[in-house]
Amino acid sequence: MSFLKNLFKKKSPTHELFHPLSRSPLTALRRRSEHIKQVYRCPISGKSVEYECPESGFPTHCNRTHWEQDKIHQSLIPKLRQINEDYHDLARPNPLPELLKLPGPMEEDEVVSLLSWDSFFYTRDFPKFQSSRTARHITSLLTYPMSIGAILHKNSPYNLKNGLTPQGLQSLTALRYMLHRPLSAQSTDPRPTRIFVLGATKECSLPPSIWLQGLNFLFPGRLFQLHFIGPEVVVPSKQPNLPSPLSLHFHQDYYHNLHRVGAFEPFDPYYDTFFLPMPLISHPLYSSSWIPTLHDLVSTRCSVWLTSPSSQRTTKDLEVLNNVLKDSIEPLLLPTVNKFASLGWSVDDSNLHEVYHANQEVFGFRALYYNVQNVSKE
């Protein structure tokens, strides 16, 4: 039995957590119900959704008859209901007391296992979770820093046997050379490791303590700069008071606009990397805005790591990458299941048939490197 299951106690009744979204006590969820009605159409008739599923609480169809006919939706009801209850659970007073008991920085000789959430929680001595719902809440936060942190760490679960390419190992060796130096060497290096989070939305609103868990605490003594970049980035009115090893920077603009004016020059593959959590590269409405950014990413010659909510989305994103960048890139990590995907379910408001775990898959690329060899003429 897994570590998480050993920790979970008997769950309390959850009936009080369920509310139809349109009648939710939470204003945000009532607004979400209205938003779904604006962007989603009945999958049977294509008409506006007016009927609210009595079992999941989501507005899903134009009438009850079509709700009964939709076999796909019927199979998704348990997941949608769990999403509903999890949202309402977070509205309770102090829903996650575990956040106040998170472990501190690792000692230099401490070893962490990154094979799974189970092994990570165990070796980092996380507090005991009260329920599987608590685990879903915690991992829905930690999935973002841990998705990139687990790639960069020397104990990464990704290797040459399960998707990491020789080029990927080369890029990570450069980054790890700086990340895992002795504390005495770290303290004399003023340059931070910079992680550029592109297309940032939820990531920029995470508590800084969550980013500390997935970055600074895994790499003792290392300095980090996080740059959240994208048109949906919310710039805080007051910058958080953070420990000096971590600094957060918010840029409410497209990356290619900032790249054009040299905002982050110079780049160094030993110090800099890019993280694109579930980018909408292949989405018809957003694909064109990503194209100039993709070209600029290649010009930095730094590693680029992406996550995806599903294998179908990964395939579509790779098609766009290959069509746009053609022969100018090489893979670093072949698409694989992300060991630190969220355990909680999420749903796309514009397609309630698309229920997924955030950051379900991970892959990576960089600019194509050419090996130059001297060939003597006979």
UniProtKB/Swiss-Prot annotation:
InterPro entries xrefs: Mss51-like_C, Mss51_Znf
Domain of life the protein comes from: Eukaryota
Localization in the cell: Mitochondrion inner membrane
Membrane topology of this protein: Peripheral membrane protein
Signal peptide start-end: none
Keywords noted in UniProt: Membrane, Mitochondrion, Mitochondrion inner membrane, mRNA processing, mRNA splicing
Single GO BP term: RNA splicing
Main subcellular location: mitochondrion
Protein name per the record: Protein mss51
Source organism (scientific name): Schizosaccharomyces pombe (strain 972 / ATCC 24843) (Fission yeast)
Phylogenetic placement of the source organism: Eukaryota, Fungi, Dikarya, Ascomycota, Taphrinomycotina
Gene name in the database record: mss51
